[in-house]
Amino acid sequence: MAQGSDIEIAREAKMQNIAEVGAKVGIPQDALLNYGPYKAKLSWDFINSVQGNQDGKLILVTAINPTPAGEGKTTTTVGLADGLNRIGKKTVAALREPSLGPCFGVKGGAAGGGYAQVVPMEDINLHFTGDFHAITSANNLLAALIDNHIYWGNKLGLDPRRIAWRRVLDMNDRALRSIVNSLGGVSNGYPREDGFDITVASEVMAILCLSSDLKDLERRLGNIHAGYTRERKAVLASELNASGAMTVLLKDALQPNMVQTLENNPVLIHGGPFANIAHGCNSVLATKTALKIADYVVTEAGFGADLGAEKFFDIKCRKAGLKPSAAVIVATIRALKMHGGVDKADLGTANPEAVRKGGVNLARHIENVRQFGVPVVVAINQFITDTDEEMAMVKEIAEAAGAEAVLCSHWANGSAGTEELARKVVLHAESGSSNFAPLYEDSMPLFEKIDTIAKRIYRATEATADSSVRNKLKGWEADGFGHLPVCMAKTQYSFSTDPALRGAPTDHVVPVRDVILSAGAEFIVAVCGDIMRMPGLPKVPSADFIKLDEQGQIQGLF
């Protein structure tokens, strides 16, 4: 009998009241701020009350460079959390909230798949508890205050040519990348070039995900560089009196959200920065709270390990003082074939030789994660078209690179399909073999940090940048920002900046075409190659297939 679609499986789920789910990890009912029977936010009183608890063990789930459909990282994170609970380890999954952009663009949903899902799936994929709308509103409030300040006399001397803040929208819309605002006459302000990013690329999103509490949130928001004067002096959001109102908009959004897996295990979903154009991790607050209430916390970082895992280690763990105990790299036979040169249309055809050739991508990711001192297990996310010979090939490739590979069937079998993976993860996590350290020191010059990532993670010969980029970095170092980590914005499909360059390329160059100071989030964004901070929709977007049926139920989310 064929397995139902993700949305059909999710609809058949026997969800527990969120209070029952919370009770499994010691969360009392009065600590939950309910959004209906199956969603809740955690109260500040509860978050503060558990800070003295001992931390559980933190497990990162990352992946090889993906196909456009993704390789099942969220599905594996959910499956592993269920698997750990199955073998008696009290476990919480800590995930990012899906963006509407990919839901209506390529993916059609991002709450796991098959029998390894988070529910209520439709709510999570759409508006959820409104956090993204609050982030969008806070971001755009600052944008409105900037233009309003210029309109009413520009007391701070903002140079309209040097406004650093863009508006955002949680949608893929290439038409908004570059616009001219304030057209239509003098009553509408001073026209200037402007543009939109997607909400998940907003610095406000990064700030929310890296803030420890409301006071820290307001401090970071106040430090945002809204723009610069003609003398190139930074104008901060606090100088525009924006940070207080922005904090008010984000007050509830800063509290983590709790939902459940299909097997009724707790999941904290909070924040959702992309890993190709932002830092790609869920909130520090959700992760640290989960660590205080569980034996194990399983979290994921976006796209491949060259992006999400590197940022998880070098930004999130560095800034939050987190020490991961183990990492899981998700690999699929289809993606390895793609890296071995097989066309998308032929990925379902058995081809062990292509798996062998594409295995260099997996081996590179294993080597890279091990550079951080973290033990690695490979999860082979099984598809029905995979052959025994191909799966054996992946195990050989992983073993040669220093990691054990485990076949996982959580999509079809739920926690029963990840029990072996869970036991392997526990073996590594409890062995004490993790010796985590970031890739570079805080004191390293900014461009040297970029170059270090390019050489050691992407295996490039060098990173390049013109004098304007280098001068920006030197200026920020002189202003006291030299200690910040760097956040690389590049394609997710390759180790290089060329999405068509598959496998494990070497001897390539990483061109840095711009750098952006995120003074509130406290990192430097290095924009590499042709990456865009506002995606576009594909020729046939998922939105074409999403609709309500005659019974008023949503169709097309998957």
UniProtKB/Swiss-Prot annotation:
Pathway the protein takes part in: One-carbon metabolism; tetrahydrofolate interconversion
Keywords of the record: ATP-binding, Ligase, Nucleotide-binding, One-carbon metabolism
Gene Ontology molecular function: ATP binding; formate-tetrahydrofolate ligase activity
Listed EC numbers: 6.3.4.3
GO biological process: tetrahydrofolate interconversion
Record-linked InterPro entries: Formate_THF_ligase, Formate_THF_ligase_CS, P-loop_NTPase
Domain of life: Bacteria
Pfam family, one: FTHFS
Phenotype seen when the gene is deleted: Mutant cannot degrade vanillate or syringate, but it can degrade protocatechuate and 3-O-methylgallate. Mutant shows O-demethylation activity toward both vanillate and syringate in the presence of tetrahydrofolate, indicating that ligH is not directly involved in the O demethylation of vanillate and syringate.
Binding positions for ATP per the UniProt entry: T67, P68, A69, G70, E71, G72, K73, T74
Similarity remark: Belongs to the formate--tetrahydrofolate ligase family.
Protein name as annotated: Formate--tetrahydrofolate ligase
